[in-house]
Amino acid sequence: MTLKNVKPDLDAAFKALEVYAEAKQHILRESTEITNETKASIGASISASTASDKKRQELLRDAETHAEKAGKILVQLQKRLKEDYGKFWRQDLISSAIFAIPEQEIVEAFALLSVLKQTEFPSRIINFRTQDPGSYLKTKTTLKVSNGAYIFGLLDCVGELSRVIEKSLDQPEFAVQTFTTMQELFGELERFTEFPNRKDPKMEKDRKSAGETESHPKAFSNLKHRIDVCRNQVLKCRKLLGNHTKLS
């Protein structure tokens, strides 16, 4: 008996796992940059909702710039993974929370920005522009995200819209308009309660970090829970607006 059939396959398996580990480390590094840019974008969008006209436009430009930077990093990351890892990189890596989270955050940032700018929501194929190195020109770029990242990113956007509404109660017309969009978006997402066990990567990561506690039960991160949270946010905003406007 010899190991001639074992060694080649074990060598190949070791190499595959080595490449996988390197790819995950690269994703982790880039994900931090994406998170920083999306947080900056969302923060600017939220601030724009209560700013005067001139300041509002300035903040929306900042929000767009940060969202575009995040998108550019992810496009470059996807390209790098395809080149280094191979054509099955998405199949093997997309289930990893560390990859799903940056996609989700980018959807959230671009979706919120679209509401504030009163433009169409982004599709799963997000169109944006990237700054050309050493130039003032921008190039049209597209980014495709996974189904899960798209759904959870839009659910996150519902949550951000509730923040916008709470800060905009002294602008009743804008607040009601934003609520109408929020309600319509949630109406499209509510059907996904049919798939209750899909996990929100961001919430799952938080749950694992906190440990299995009463405040972070196992169901905390599933899709049904996220939809229930958004439903409560819609109802809360409806009540708030009912107290401040003629919304019925």
Regions of interest found by a model, annotated:
Residues V19-E33, A51, K55-D62, I94-I101, ...:
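Non-transmembrane, amphipathic alpha-helical segments
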Residues T139-T181, L185, L189:
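Surface-exposed interaction/gating patches
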Residues L59-K140:
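Long, charged all-alpha helical bundle/coiled-coil segments in cytosolic proteins
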